């Protein structure tokens, strides 16, 4: 399953194309700066990326586009983990 979208690169402000792909129960993210460019793998997903993936899965689920409830639960768990890591990283010590 693939979910594609675009956003702005937080470092440069340039438009970038993103892809979240689930294969064998594992999510991988990749990006590119040009529409027809090569994909760069190994992107570490942010909270916003997980929120976008969850939103897209929930939309597809109601249309039955190959999304199962287990997929949504998995992404919700990964999003909760990303939120916890973000809170730990941003907490004042």
Task: Give residue spans per PLM region.
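Domain-level signature for proteins that mediate thiol-based redox and metal-cofactor handling
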Residues: 1-3, 24, 51-52
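Short, surface-exposed coil-to-beta transition loops
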Residues: 13-17
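A general, composition-driven signal for non-globular sequence regions
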Residues: 9-10, 24-26, 70
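Short beta-strand segments and strand-loop junctions that repeat across beta-rich extracellular domains
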Residues: 19-37
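Negatively charged, low-complexity tracts enriched in Asp/Glu with abundant Ser/Thr
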Residues: 1-12, 33-37, 89-93
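Mixed-charge, Lys/Arg-enriched low-complexity segments
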Residues: 36-93
């Amino acid at each position: 399953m693939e979910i594609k979208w675009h956003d702005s690169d937080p470092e440069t402000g340039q438009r970038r194309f993103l892809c979240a792909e689930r294969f064998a129960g594992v999510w991988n993210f990749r990006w590119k700066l040009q529409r027809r460019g090569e994909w760069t793998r190994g992107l570490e997903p942010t909270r916003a990326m997980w929120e976008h993936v969850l939103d897209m899965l929930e939309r597809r689920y109601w249309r039955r586009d190959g999304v199962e409830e287990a997929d949504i639960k998995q992404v919700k768990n990964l999003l909760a983990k990303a939120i916890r890591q973000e809170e730990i990283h941003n907490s004042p010590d």
